Amino acid sequence: MAEPITFDRDAVGQPPAGWTCGATGKGTPQWTVETEPGGTRRVLKQSGRAAFPWCVKNDIALTDGWVEVRFHPISGREDQAGGVVWRWKDGDNYYVARANALENNVSLYHTTAGSRQTIEYRDAPVAKNVWHTLRVDFKGASIRVALDGKVTIDLQDTHIQGAGKAGVWTKADSVTLFDAFAYGNAGP
């Protein structure tokens, strides 16, 4: 497994260096590196409000591989989501897998031409104010999503193909912390 990317060397109150942050749809995302409440380590926090805020690592180009992140849903009246994006071409074209503490489920979507479409969702316990790990393994049309080590979605889909960036994602008014972002190429 690759060494997880942390935000401990990034400036507090700013987006992380080497990442591009924005949103699909309307709104104003607020991606900043902050000191974890009650702790000393720095984490990435999304605290703005937008349809689908995302923040992608600039130097990634994965066709087949895996993406993993630790996320901590803090609050949100509409949503309390944390997710990962991959095969990200731009803010309107990518895959996303997310877990939602308000709905207690894990979902897989493709976003094409700025329109998010559900591929699959499954009920799963997602506690608020707790760190979780979300991982996606993808190779060709195969996509496997796991929450806290348990596979929740395992299917085939071909909506988004070819290499793309990877990063993190939230929804609506979710206030979510992210840490230990990791990624790698698929094995043989």
Describe the function of each predicted region.
Residues 170-180:
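Extracellular carbohydrate recognition
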Residues 1-23, 179-180:
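Extracellular carbohydrate-recognition regions
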Residues 71-73, 138, 183:
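Hydrophobic beta-strand positions in extracellular immunoglobulin-like domains
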Residues 12, 46-112, 171:
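Secretory/extracellular carbohydrate-interaction modules
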Residues 146-171:
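Short, solvent-exposed beta-strand-to-loop segments that form ligand-recognition rims
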Residues 7, 67-69, 129-145:
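Short tryptophan-centered beta-strand motifs in secreted/extracellular beta-sheet-rich domains
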Residues 112-133:
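Short, aromatic/His-centered strand-loop micro-motif at the edge of beta-sheets
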Residues 14-43, 48-51:
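Extracellular glycan-recognition surfaces and repeat-rich motifs
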